[in-house]
Amino acid sequence: MNDTTSVKEQHPISLLTVATIMCAVLYAIGAYSTAYIPSPWGVGQFRPAVVIPAFFAVIFGPMPAAVGAAIGTLIADSVKHGYLYPGSFLAAVPGNFIGFFLFGYIVKKKFTWGRFILASNVTLTVANLIVAFLYITVFKVLYLSQPAYVALSWDAIVFLSVGLTIWWFVTMLPFVLIITPLLIRAVAAAFPSVVPKDVRTHSLKEELPKITFSLAMLVPGLIMLLIGLATTFTVVGNYISSNFGPPIPTLIELMFYASGVVLFVLGILIYTGQKFIWHSSLKEKIEK
């Protein structure tokens, strides 16, 4: 798609404003619905609602998704804690804004499902790493000066930040790669005038070979299994036990194995049964 076509298909400001508000509200509701499911690290939450700003990034571009995600996460965190939560605007807000701006930027000029996979991996890595590092260092250590976190060495803080990033990544990736495409294609079929032309006309079967999509699950799954084995049979497990008290070491080990198995199985299922996940009738509706 050339630049001229892109300009012609720009959404009006009024629609982008409405999209931003919708993204923020839906993301806040979705994030709050799982706000009380914690990570095995003791901080952070289970958040499959990231499919919402990912969807808005594809349909409406970087800014509605970024602003909507930032506002939505602040609302959800503040409602959970009962006040304007400093940990959210110090960590979650900048992480969500940067992450979903990157998502929208990557897929904006030319959408393909390959770029969608790239955007998903970049966003979930960068955004979660920003949130994890800022939440631990800026909020827990510098802002609150909580003894349990102040006592951690810098290598333990980095380890915890990376570990929290991994947790978020492996629990968000399946939802983004499976549910978001379904939402995109459903909206493209129901409201084609709102969806950019390149998004509307591309189909999963044409743009995303099943082996590519499967590898997007299989590779992280294999990595998680290998990390789990390293946790069990190498000094990594001893390091976790010496820096983080029970039951965190056991939960972390279980996290690596469970997420590895789930991602690996999903990758196999997608490869062997893709037509049952993305039905061809949706493709036909979009092409019409």
Positions of predicted regions on the chain:
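Loop-helix junctions at membrane interfaces
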Residues: 1-288
